[in-house]
Swiss-Prot record:
Protein name (record): Chorismate synthase
Reaction(s) catalysed by this chain's protein: 5-O-(1-carboxyvinyl)-3-phosphoshikimate = chorismate + phosphate
Record-listed E.C. numbers: 4.2.3.5
Lineage: Bacteria, Pseudomonadati, Pseudomonadota, Gammaproteobacteria, Chromatiales
Primary gene name: aroC
Note on cofactor: Reduced FMN (FMNH(2)).
Function: This reaction introduces a second double bond into the aromatic ring system.
Length: 367
């Protein structure tokens, strides 16, 4: 199975299945000398872990990460960093009924067609459980970017179902179960989750990530544009069906005079581009959004077929998120961190001695 490694110079390879003994990964390309402990990674893992909120899956995993290599006496050595997270709360019996049946809207059918065999327990490799290692790896990148470059990465729930959420108070994001920066709307979110759960259904969502204080110059045209790699990174997250950068799809309805981000000596007049021009960071904040479909794991019966192609009705049992978008926030932050870290190293490798001769314009503050 290929496709398990992400990045060019700062690479992450993950392994493991939802109900296997453990998840793991190898982070290669991290510069030496970065102060790093398991506790530094655990902070981010705790934001993502299942069972932390009554509004998400009730599978309870501690997601305790172990650093197996690449760190000596509290600092990175420049060698591969091995990570391991044990699975401790598998309940595989919940999935016995789908061993011969395909859940509609899931990867069961496509994995069977591609590999001829599949681990049906909790979705196996296709489960969002795999993203725990991404969050741990992203925490390494975030730590480097923050300490060495002053780059800040923050994310929020931007929409749940028909409820669109503003960025009213970023400081509130980690103080509620929804990663919501619009705290006045939280009662609406709670009511929607209760309604969906009672109906045995699920609901979609959108998340937004901002990467602040990014230096200009990151991105490798033409095929490894910064925005292209951000889109790829977010599209690799389970359930993501669409990605926008800056104005995104709204640009189709704009005029050029409104969309262009005019330049002044005092800085950019706007950020419709989402911090990327020509595939290269402009020094503005990177702004990306991802839309996540409502999970197909639900108690409402759905039509499908079995492994013999015969019609069946499927009800997905087990412990599932009624809205997978909630826990996607720290995952999206991690993937953005991996992209920016990788592009920083690539930029430094080729252009470390470049002096543009042009002043760096101040970024426009959205707050």
């Amino acid at each position: 199975m290929s496709g398990n490694t992400f990045g060019t110079l700062f690479t992450v390879t993950t392994f493991g299945e939802s109900h296997g003994p453990a998840l793991g990964g190898v982070v290669d390309g991290c510069p030496p000398g970065l102060a790093l402990t398991e506790a530094d990674l655990q902070v981010e893992l705790d934001r993502r872990r299942p069972g932390r909120s009554k509004h998400t899956t009730q599978r309870r995993e501690s997601d305790q990460v172990q650093i197996l290599s690449g760190v000596f006496e509290g600092v990175t050595t420049g060698t591969p960093i091995g990570l391991l997270i044990e699975n401790t709360d598998q309940r595989s019996k919940d999935y016995s009924e789908i061993a011969q049946r395909f859940r509609p809207g899931h990867a069961d059918y496509t994995y069977q067609q591609k590999y001829g065999v599949r681990d049906y327990r909790g979705g196996g490799r296709s489960s969002a459980r795999e993203t725990a290692v991404r969050v741990a790896a992203g925490a390494i990148a975030r730590r480097y970017l923050a300490q060495r470059l002053g780059i800040e990465i923050r994310g929020r729930l931007a929409q749940m179902g028909g409820i669109e959420l503003g960025a009213e108070d970023w400081s509130a994001v980690d103080d509620n179960d929804f990663f919501c920066a619009d705290p006045a709307r939280i009662p609406e979110l709670e009511a929607l989750i209760q309604e969906v759960r009672k109906a045995g259904d699920s609901v979609g969502a959108a998340v937004e990530v901002e990467v602040r204080h990014v230096p200009p110059g990151l991105g490798e045209p033409v095929f490894d544009r910064l925005d292209a790699d951000l889109a790829k990174a977010l599209m690799s997250i389970n359930a993501v069906k669409g990605v926008e950068v800056g104005a995104g799809m709204a640009a189709a309805g704009q005029r050029g005079s409104a969309h262009r981000d005019e330049l002044t000596p005092a800085g950019f007049a706007g950020n419709q581009s989402g911090g990327v021009l020509g595939g290269i960071s402009s020094g503005q904040d990177l702004v990306v959004r991802a839309a996540l479909k409502p999970t197909s794991s639900m108690l409402i019966p759905g039509r499908s077929v079995d492994v013999h192609g015969e019609p069946v009705s499927v009800v997905t049992k087990g412990r599932h998120d009624p809205c997978v978008g909630i826990r996607a926030v720290p995952i999206a932050e991690a993937m953005a961190a991996l992209v920016v870290m990788d592009h920083w190293l690539r930029h430094r490798a080729q252009n470390a001695d470049v002096e543009s001769g042009t002043p760096v314009l101040p970024a426009r503050d959205r707050e």
